[in-house]
A protein has these predicted regions:
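Short alpha-helical elements
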Residues: 1-86
Length: 86
């Protein structure tokens, strides 16, 4: 599979968007949030089941629950719309 890590430039743009997004919590550990976004990217590229998420991205169930929260809050939809015009 191709590398799903974000470049520093990509992460900076995503992080700046998320800081303005009231329903997306980055937290004090920005690297953990970056790993979360990379985990979602890995899932979308691999088509795998959540339980097969590599451990380097964190606990699959925690990543899944956060993904679902962001889905329900519309974070992903707004992010995609934002970057579609970028």
């Amino acid at each position: 599979m191709t590398d799903v890590r974000l470049t520093d430039d990509q992460w900076t743009k995503i992080r700046d968007f998320l800081r303005q997004e009231p329903n997306a919590y980055i937290g004090k550990d920005e690297q953990a949030c970056r790993r979360f976004v990379e985990a979602v990217k890995w899932m979308s590229r691999s088509g795998s089941q959540w339980r097969l998420l590599p451990a380097e991205y964190g606990n699959w169930n925690s990543v899944y629950k956060r993904f679902v929260r962001w889905c329900k809050a519309g974070v992903w939809e707004r992010m995609l719309a934002h970057f579609a015009t970028d």
